[in-house]
């Protein structure tokens, strides 16, 4: 692995360990962003299962004209994920930014999820 990949992997692990300490049984809202799309899911780490998920690859979001690589798509994914999570009975989560900076698409997704009913 290159030094950059090692550094990113360590950062991701460090963030996840800190989240486990402060989670207190709350599910984790995990974000993955690629150069073209953004993905998010609410995970119950105690049971090891995904409670809700959304991504910019979904047909309903692609038909809206969002490419997935912009802030508007991240907002749409955050809103959709929050609606699905609230429907499953999840109101409080721990935000796992996955080592990404809390800026741009990651911040837009988090803000949209907050506005749609999730608290973190």
Curated annotation (Swiss-Prot):
Pfam families from the UniProt entry: Ribosomal_L18p (PF00861)
Positions of disulphide bridges: none
Keyword rRNA-binding annotated: yes
GO BP annotations, alphabetical order: translation
Similarity remark: Belongs to the universal ribosomal protein uL18 family.
Subunit (UniProt): Part of the 50S ribosomal subunit; part of the 5S rRNA/L5/L18/L25 subcomplex. Contacts the 5S and 23S rRNAs.
Biological function: This is one of the proteins that bind and probably mediate the attachment of the 5S RNA into the large ribosomal subunit, where it forms part of the central protuberance.
Name this polypeptide is given: Large ribosomal subunit protein uL18
Gene behind this protein: rplR
């Amino acid at each position: 692995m290159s030094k950059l990949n090692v550094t990113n992997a360590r950062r991701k692990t460090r963030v996840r360990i800190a989240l486990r300490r402060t989670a207190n049984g709350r599910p984790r809202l995990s974000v993955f962003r690629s150069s073209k799309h953004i993905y998010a899911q609410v995970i119950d780490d105690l049971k090891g299962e995904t409670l809700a998920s959304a991504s910019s690859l979904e047909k309903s979001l692609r038909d809206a004209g969002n490419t997935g690589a912009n802030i508007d798509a991240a907002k749409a994914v955050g809103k959709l994920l929050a609606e699905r999570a609230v429907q499953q009975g999840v109101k409080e989560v721990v935000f796992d930014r996955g080592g990404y900076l809390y800026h741009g698409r990651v911040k837009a997704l988090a803000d949209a999820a907050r506005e749609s009913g999730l608290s973190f």
